[in-house]
Amino acid sequence: MATTHGIALGMIETRGLVPAIEAADAMTKAAEVRLVGRSFVGGGYVTVMVRGETGAVNAAVRAGADACERVGDGLVAAHIIARVHSEVEIILPETPEDSDSAWCIANLNS
């Protein structure tokens, strides 16, 4: 039988980099979450991902979505997965061992 992990995943997809950075900033300020990655989907779409406890991820994604909407018409989607299945973990970015903000910034902008 497959297993699940207790750490939640929050995702915000935006139109453009500026709303993505605004959302990432708001998410990390709003709750105790880790910025674990971003993905340039194509066509100007960017997805930003955070991990943490379910309640914190929920608060962070709400704050990030609100911040993204204030920038303009940047919000495409916001979603939370409470307990990510172990089979899904292999396609997600690795979580940094410590909450090094330099790592987060470097991986957001690279």
UniProtKB/Swiss-Prot annotation:
Stored Gene3D superfamilies: 3.30.70.1710
SMART domains hit by this protein: BMC
Compartment list: Carboxysome
Membrane-spanning segments: none
Domain of life of the organism encoding this protein: Bacteria
Disruption phenotype: Required for growth in ambient air.
Keyword Disulfide bond (UniProt): no
Domain BMC: residue ranges: 8-93
Keyword Transferase: no
Cellular component terms (Gene Ontology): carboxysome
Biotech use: Expression of 10 genes for alpha-carboxysome (Cb) proteins (cbbL-cbbS-csoS2-csoS3-csoS4A-csoS4B-csoS1C-csoS1A-csoS1B-csoS1D) in E.coli generates compartments that resemble Cb, contain RuBisCO and have its catalytic activity, showing it is possible to make artificial, functional Cb using these 10 genes. Cargo proteins can be targeted to these organelles. Artificial Cb assembly in E.coli requires csoS2-csoS4A-csoS4B-csoS1C-csoS1A-csoS1B-csoS1D (but not the gene for carbonic anhydrase, csoS3).
Keywords: Bacterial microcompartment, Carbon dioxide fixation, Carboxysome
Gene Ontology biological process: carbon fixation
Pfam families: BMC (PF00936)
InterPro entries attached to this UniProt entry: Bact_microcomp_CS, BMC_dom, BMC_shell, CcmK-like_sf, CcmK/CsoS1_BMC
Subunit structure: Homohexamer with a small central pore. Interacts with the N-terminus (residues 1-136) of RuBisCO (CbbL).
Functional note: One of shell proteins of the carboxysome, a polyhedral inclusion where RuBisCO (ribulose bisphosphate carboxylase, ccbL-ccbS) is sequestered. Assembles into hexamers which make sheets that form the facets of the polyhedral carboxysome. The shell probably limits the diffusion of CO(2) into and out of the carboxysome. There are estimated to be 540 CsoS1B proteins per carboxysome.
Similarity remark: Belongs to the bacterial microcompartments protein family. CsoS1 subfamily.
Domain notes: The tight homohexamer forms a small pore which is positively charged.
UniProt protein name: Carboxysome shell protein CsoS1B
Natural source organism: Halothiobacillus neapolitanus (strain ATCC 23641 / c2) (Thiobacillus neapolitanus)
Taxonomic lineage: Bacteria, Pseudomonadati, Pseudomonadota, Gammaproteobacteria, Chromatiales
